[in-house]
Amino acid sequence: MNSNDILIANTDDLRSDMDYLEKTLLKGHRIDPNLYEEYDVKRGLRDSTGRGVLTGLTEVSDVCGFDVINGRKIPAEGGLYYQGINVNDLINGLKGKRFGFEETTFLLLFGLLPKKDELAHFLKVLSELEDLSGRFVRDVVMKASSSNIMNALQRCVLTLYTYDENPEDISVENALRQALELIAKLPLIAVYSYHAYRHFRKDETLLIRNPEKGRSLAENILYMLRPDGQYTELEAKVLDVALILHAEHGGGNNSTFTTHVVTSSGTDTYSAIAASIGSLKGPRHGGANLKAQGMFCLLYTSPSPRDP
């Protein structure tokens, strides 16, 4: 038997041992499903009827997808509200070449739509906070590139802790500063992580472009993402609306609930947001977008829409 045979044999032994441990684990942790109903235990954030479980109160946003009449869910025209304002009204209120994500961010954070001078000041703050140091891009974003951008975001957010001179301070003032920095920096981290993935995993040309002052967040994402930096006004508008619609979905969704749980321990902002990103990544939450994209790709490549 040569060294390769020994390696294969050891690998087979390990696989057999792991199979045994897995079966033992599954046998040792089983709870009668009927006990959940008997003790009225909620398995997740919905009860047995599909209704959301009340875990807290919020005025930030609300989602309405159905009415409950006599204990039955009746489909209704969906509605999404930010600080009591219908999102449709927010989007319809955008005129000309205005972009609305930054205004929506201000609304969600501070509870009211910004005046012209307030918006200008807010945009200036975000612009000043968006820069990533070359050292961070080189040592964090480019190292150990991930095939999943959500995983890359989670890792980068955790590492931002070490670049913060006051990471443990959870006062309102400092937490707001950290939140604004994350809002400003995450688009860059997402785009750069994607380029790192394409370069190191797909052998594509590496492209890193700095954001350009004066562009909206949606415009800068496309500007940094595209090799030639070009995009149409329609593309930027569609992305801006998508960002608005994804900005917040009520205080009871999985990732927001994760934030409540993790921050209740008094931990730092970066740990809380990283945990929430991990929750958002799941296929039953934000990761469902990838599943939907996969369905479209399947329809596109199938000879017939009816083919599996």
Regions inferred by a protein language model and the residue ranges of each:
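Beta-strand-enriched accessory nucleic-acid recognition/scaffold domains that flank the catalytic cores
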Residues: 2-25, 172-176
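An N-terminal structural lobe/cap that precedes and organizes the functional/catalytic core
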Residues: 16, 21-23, 27-136
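An acidic intrinsically disordered interaction segment
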Residues: 62-75, 124, 236-253, 260
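Short, hydrophobic/aliphatic alpha-helical segments
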Residues: 83-102, 239-240, 252-279
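Conserved phosphate/anionic-ligand binding catalytic regions in large, soluble enzymes, centered on
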Residues: 106-114, 266-294
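Glycine-rich, mobile lid/loop segments that gate access to catalytic sites or pores
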Residues: 140-250
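Helix-rich, well-folded core regions that mediate interactions or catalysis
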Residues: 296-298
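Single conserved hydrophobic/aromatic residue that forms the stacking wall/gate
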Residues: 300-308
